[in-house]
Design a protein with these regions (language model features):
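N-terminal export leaders
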Residues: 3-11
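Central antiparallel beta-sheet cores of small beta-barrel/beta-sandwich binding domains
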Residues: 50, 54-135, 141, 145-147
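N-terminal helix-cap/turn-to-beta initiation motif at the start of protein domains
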Residues: 30-46
Length: 150
């Protein structure tokens, strides 16, 4: 039997200074929230997610749905994401994740600059990374503050 799970995601696009110094959410504030999000268990099989992109002002810039095919071998995971955006465009991203002994996660994908870093607390996961976004023949490096909630 195939299990499908649903996840909510809110992604804020922000300059790096806003990511590190002015974030309005605090991951520790979710520490007592239930159920606890264990990425290696939750992201195993097919996961449906719905999300938004928000600009620095908090205004919704774009909506999306994503179907993820996920698997883990030990502390190494693969999330194969198929996005459909509100304007009808589609995109695919394959994350390669590592769960570290101290509980944080790192990950890479073809359009991610460097290494993504994240951590869970309670029912929330905060994931920070820089994405290489092609726009009109140019590539922009945009910092993402990606939050996922059960």
């Amino acid at each position: 039997m195939i299990q499908r799970r649903t996840l909510l995601s809110a992604t804020a696009v922000a300059p790096l200074a806003a990511l590190t110094g002015c974030a309005s959410q605090n991951l520790a504030g979710y520490a007592s929230e239930k159920p606890v999000l264990d990425l290696t268990q939750y992201f195993n099989g097919t996961v449906d997610a719905h999300g938004i992109f928000q600009g620095r002002s908090g205004q919704i810039a774009r909506r999306f749905t994503v179907v993820m095919e996920c698997s883990w071998k030990g502390n190494e995971g693969v999330l194969d994401e198929a996005f459909t955006y509100s304007d009808g465009t589609t995109q695919r991203r394959i994350w390669r994740l590592t769960k570290h002994a101290d509980g944080h996660y790192t990950g890479t994908a073809d359009d991610v600059v460097g290494t993504a870093r994240g951590q869970t607390q309670g029912n929330a996961f905060r994931w920070g990374y820089t994405l290489a976004l092609p726009v009109d023949g140019k590539v922009y490096h945009v910092d993402f503050d990606d939050w996922m909630y059960l």
